[in-house]
Design a protein with these regions (language model features):
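ATP-binding N-terminal substructure of ATP-dependent carboxylate-amine bond-forming enzymes
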Residues: 1-136, 149-157, 408
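ATP-dependent carboxylate activation and anion-phosphoryl transfer catalytic cores
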Residues: 7-27, 31-34, 39, 59-60, ...
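Conserved beta3 strand of the protein kinase N-lobe
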Residues: 144-145
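Acidic/histidine-enriched active-site and ligand-binding environments that engage anionic O-linkages
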Residues: 158-167
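N-terminal nucleotide-binding beta1-loop-alpha1 segment
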Residues: 170
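A short acidic, helix-capping loop that chelates divalent metal ions and anchors anionic groups
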Residues: 176-178
Length: 455
């Protein structure tokens, strides 16, 4: 499928606009400046007082507090890029990071989009098509419908054939929306219609497909980097099984449940698939790992940087954002054997939410004392007197630690969480401390439905 033939031209990017906000915008600003380049930060009215904006080479307000008026406002972002004579756009994650229309518009305005092509992005954003292509690439896929479902009757026929439980998924889906687990035939029709309706509302596309439901799986993903010369490397795997309603809360690397043979097969499969589709940039292949800890199945590919890329950086020593920029400039990746993955890293997503019910807790942070110590990292845009807005994601920071092994990493994370003091709003710090003491977590027995069943 890969038809990469044209000669790659190297070009130096000098001024990069960051089409995002918060901690990932700050992180991008830092890396861009370390590379000797200029950074342009965009912001909405709601973010006008954020301190991190002052660290950029330039900043520009692009619209109102609503995402649709600012961080999703393509004309405003392109205008800002042209006004400040940017030559590239870094998308981060969320917002427009996986919007193929945005990628095409960037190209039309001679702006380098730091990520994959619109064609590959479009291919992998359609979950049903992506599954078919990954099957062609040799990836194990879950049994289910071949393409999109045309009707409830077709769903019923396939479910009868492969057996219950099944799961109905939105083709354009993500974040658990447009997704329904069907335990038996009597519930299929109502849940099929509910998934269609939710998918249409969330994504403007009601298309759905059906798969066999894997009970109590682990969520394992592989981080890859691919350059414009056809080279692909992996930066290990991550275990993201601690999640609530498909939203990740704690991530770690390596996945200690994997036998070495299974790990090698997983990593090789991801590299082969990335080459097959001609991928360029940073990407993540997500898999469901069966409870036997041996069989894994392709779930989806995220054609962007992941929130949890940080733990892959901690064990590899690579700066993934720096490499995304280098790839966009036409540079070649290092050889796989030129770096090794060492130790164990854990990330806890700290959100402005009630730690028991996960209700949002926006408002003013009256006190902020960040943890420190060797191999403790906090990626955050928040600070004392920062007002957590109601308009965006509730994450206020990512606490990341590295240890020689998993036990040391857990101990370091516990100590760092206890040091971390945030007053004025509720946060999920107490939840993370509780999870780190959980016997099943310590034994790496957590599966994707664990929190819903036990908390």
């Amino acid at each position: 499928m890969n038809k990469r033939n044209k000669k790659v031209e190297k070009k130096e990017l000098s001024r990069i606009l960051i089409a995002n906000r918060g901690e990932i915008a700050l992180r991008a600003i830092q890396t861009i400046q370390e590379m000797g380049k200029e950074s342009i930060a965009i912001y909405s009215i709601a973010d006008k007082d954020a301190h991190y904006l002052n660290t950029a080479s330039a900043k520009v307000c692009i619209g109102g507090a609503k995402s649709s008026e600012s961080y999703l406002n393509i004309p405003a972002i392109i205008s800002a890029a042209e006004l400040f004579e940017a030559d590239a756009i870094f998308p981060g994650y969320g917002f427009l990071s996986e919007n193929q229309n945005f990628v095409e518009i960037c190209s039309h305005h001679s702006l380098e989009f730091i990520g994959p092509s619109a064609k590959v992005m479009a291919l992998m954003s359609d979950k049903s098509k992506a599954k078919s292509v990954m099957k062609e690439a040799g990836m194990p896929v879950i049994e289910g419908s071949e393409g999109l479902l045309k009707s409830y009757q077709e769903a019923e026929e396939i479910a009868d054939k492969i057996g219950y439980p099944v799961i109905i998924k939105a083709a354009a889906g993500g974040g658990g929306r447009g997704m329904r687990v069907v335990e038996d035939k009597s519930k299929l029709k109502n849940l099929y219609l509910a998934a269609e309706t939710e998918a249409l509302s969330a994504f403007g596309d009601g298309s759905v497909y059906l798969e066999k439901f894997i009970n109590k799986p682990k969520h394992i993903e592989v981080q890859i980097l691919a350059d414009k010369h056809g080279n692909v490397i992996h930066v290990g795997e991550r275990d993201c099984s601690v999640q609530r309603r498909q939203q990740k809360l704690i991530e770690e690397t390596p996945a200690v449940v994997l036998e070495e043979g299974v790990r090698e097969r997983l990593l090789e499969t991801a590299i082969k698939a990335a080459k097959y589709i001609g991928y360029v940039g940073a990407g993540t292949f997500e898999f469901l790992l069966d409870s036997n800890m041996k069989d894994f199945y392709f779930m989806e590919m995220n054609t962007r940087l992941q929130v949890e890329h940080t733990i892959s950086e901690m064990v590899s020593g690579l700066n993934l954002i720096e490499w995304m920029i280098k790839i966009a400039q036409g540079e070649k990746l290092p050889k796989q054997e030129s770096f090794s993955l060492k130790g164990h890293a854990i990330e806890c997503r700290i959100t402005a939410e009630d730690p028991k019910k996960f209700y949002p807790s926006p408002g003013k942070i009256t006190e902020w004392i960040a943890p420190g110590g060797v191999n403790v990292r906090l990626d955050s845009h928040a600070h004392a007197n920062y007002v957590v807005p109601t308009h965006y994601d509730s994450m206020i920071g990512k606490l990341i630690v590295w240890g020689e092994n998993r036990e040391r990493a857990i101990a370091k994370m516990k100590r760092a969480l206890k040091e971390f003091k945030v007053e004025g709003i509720k946060t999920t710090i107490p939840f993370h401390l509780e999870m780190l003491e959980n016997a099943d977590f310590r034994q790496a027995k957590i599966h994707t439905k664990y929190l819903e069943e036990n908390f």
